[in-house]
């Protein structure tokens, strides 16, 4: 829809979140709520702007990382507070202008499209609320919107109305430009309300209609409890879509999946699995209580109780319980248990014994460990990086490897065992006959 502009209002302080962090940067399913609504906005137009004030630079930086083309506007909260005041400095360029909120991350592009396609000069979203407290009441007369009355300014009769303002609007641009300068702040909060556009539009004979929407999709987030409710809704949607696409989940209610994660082929997620960040998982099994972060997993089985940290690429590999991989590239490897494999590259056919550690950090910098094909690493081995282990190598159990190992070699680095006969009885002052 190249003829449509979208303005997202995100200038509020979000005091009910009780945090120094801006409200719109709180995450749902791994991504800030402002990013969720931006994704939906860009699904229908390339003309998108965000109105900011509190922590403008911080929010703008996060937005620009993902959507650099986004227009950033600043609201003058001192002189023009309120939702209409937010549009004071915004550039309105499309034939239609959709105005929505940055704290409604469950809104879908299809919802915005319905507003844009409405046969009206102004279309506003509304729903029948089970509990309308806190919402602006929508006064509908003859199928048209007569007025919107904010909770703070509503009479007893108006408070009984359950049809409420969901917070999104679509205006014909020329009408919005005509009406905005006419809005006054003559209300208890001394704010410029966007809802007043309805009253003014009706006075001027413009057509204002209500578009009924889902209360769930238009849920606003004002505190951390509402954040948790919205995240559960989004999690359920993500998991339902994935299961319908062929991903098998054991106890799906216990699983967390980031909204950026992608799955391909037949995958299994067991209970209490967390898939964090932009993971790509293909034809793999992730066993119970495992955590995968920003990594690529293909043709592998991971866990249980494994931790795959960011920038890992694991292919055709078995990762067992209590194994941690960080920034590791593993192809055709077996690492069964109790190992740390950080900043490493391990080739096919290699077996990593229990208790193996890549010692990748010297207190100042991280170093890489490279392990070739068909290497057998005995239990309780320390590989002190930087170090290269060639193909076809055996590392003896209990070794600390500090130098490169050539192909075909046995590397052993440990003290020679010595057995002192009778030492137990001497040490504890016991006679051998007393046993």
From Swiss-Prot:
GO cellular component, one term: membrane
Active site: 337
Region described as Pyrophosphorylase: 1-224
Chain positions covered by the region annotation N-acetyltransferase: 246-435
Cofactor(s) needed by this chain: Mg(2+)
InterPro entries recorded: Bifunctional_GlmU, GlmU-like, GlmU_C_LbH, Hexapep, Hexapep_transf_CS, MobA-like_NTP_Trfase, Nucleotide-diphossugar_trans, Trimer_LpxA-like_sf
Binding site for Mg(2+): 103, 222
Linker: annotated segments: 225-245
Entry EC no(s): 2.7.7.23, 2.3.1.157
Gene3D superfamilies attached to this UniProt entry: Hexapeptide repeat proteins, Spore Coat Polysaccharide Biosynthesis Protein SpsA, Chain A
PROSITE patterns: HEXAPEP_TRANSFERASES
Keyword annotations from UniProtKB, A to Z: Acyltransferase, Cell shape, Cell wall biogenesis/degradation, Cytoplasm, Magnesium, Metal-binding, Multifunctional enzyme, Nucleotidyltransferase, Peptidoglycan synthesis, Repeat, Transferase
Pfam families in UniProt: Hexapep, NTP_transf_3
Pathway involvement of the protein, from the record: Nucleotide-sugar biosynthesis; UDP-N-acetyl-alpha-D-glucosamine biosynthesis; N-acetyl-alpha-D-glucosamine 1-phosphate from alpha-D-glucosamine 6-phosphate (route II): step 2/2; Nucleotide-sugar biosynthesis; UDP-N-acetyl-alpha-D-glucosamine biosynthesis; UDP-N-acetyl-alpha-D-glucosamine from N-acetyl-alpha-D-glucosamine 1-phosphate: step 1/1; Bacterial outer membrane biogenesis; LPS lipid A biosynthesis
Residues that, per the record, bind UDP-N-acetyl-alpha-D-glucosamine: 9-12, 23, 75, 82-83, 136, 150, 165, 222, 309, 326, 340, 351
Enzyme category, top tier: transferase
Binding positions (acetyl-CoA): 360-361, 379, 397, 414
Main location: cytoplasm
HAMAP family the record matches: GlmU (MF_01631)
Subunit and interaction comment: Homotrimer.
Role: Catalyzes the last two sequential reactions in the de novo biosynthetic pathway for UDP-N-acetylglucosamine (UDP-GlcNAc). The C-terminal domain catalyzes the transfer of acetyl group from acetyl coenzyme A to glucosamine-1-phosphate (GlcN-1-P) to produce N-acetylglucosamine-1-phosphate (GlcNAc-1-P), which is converted into UDP-GlcNAc by the transfer of uridine 5-monophosphate (from uridine 5-triphosphate), a reaction catalyzed by the N-terminal domain.
Record protein name field: Bifunctional protein GlmU
Organism: Campylobacter curvus (strain 525.92)
Gene: glmU
